[in-house]
């Protein structure tokens, strides 16, 4: 007989937490290493947010509640809107100034 295995028999909560911490660390490393390009900074922040969402979903499945998964979907929706607005502002700034370097944007403060 063919036995259908549950995914949680092989992948425990610790595996998800390790994956999440690795993704968060990669995002943090990218944030610290690429401080001159705004697009790299936005991508690193999105990686860190993805790691948090992996934690929400993993704990939600572990506790057998849907609230973490629903919260994760809401966070992803807000993050997508935030990224779209940020990239639109960045595109307008690039059309006006011709550069998206952090040092050029800091000069706008006055």
From Swiss-Prot:
Signal peptide: none
Compartments, as annotated in UniProt: Cell inner membrane
GO molecular function, one term: quinone binding
One GO CC term on file: plasma membrane
Cross-referenced InterPro entries: NADH_UbQ_OxRdtase_chain4L/K (IPR001133), NUOK/Mnh_C1-like (IPR039428)
HAMAP family assigned to the protein according to its UniProt record, in alphabetical order: NDH1_NuoK (MF_01456)
The protein's role, per its UniProt record: NDH-1 shuttles electrons from NADH, via FMN and iron-sulfur (Fe-S) centers, to quinones in the respiratory chain. The immediate electron acceptor for the enzyme in this species is believed to be ubiquinone. Couples the redox reaction to proton translocation (for every two electrons transferred, four hydrogen ions are translocated across the cytoplasmic membrane), and thus conserves the redox energy in a proton gradient.
Subunit structure: NDH-1 is composed of 14 different subunits. Subunits NuoA, H, J, K, L, M, N constitute the membrane sector of the complex.
Protein name per the record: NADH-quinone oxidoreductase subunit K
UniProt source species: Rickettsia prowazekii (strain Madrid E)
Gene: nuoK
């Amino acid at each position: 007989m063919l036995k259908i295995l549950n995914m949680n028999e092989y992948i425990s909560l610790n595996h998800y937490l390790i994956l999440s911490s690795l993704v968060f660390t990669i995002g943090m490393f990218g944030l610290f290493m690429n401080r001159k390009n705004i697009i790299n900074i936005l991508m690193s922040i999105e990686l860190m947010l993805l790691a948090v969402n992996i934690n929400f979903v993993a704990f939600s499945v572990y506790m057998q509640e849907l609230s973490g998964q629903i919260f994760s979907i809401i966070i992803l929706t807000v993050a997508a809107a935030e990224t779209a607005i940020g990239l639109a502002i960045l595109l307008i700034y690039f059309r006006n100034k011709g550069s998206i370097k952090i040092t050029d944007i800091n000069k706008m403060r006055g």
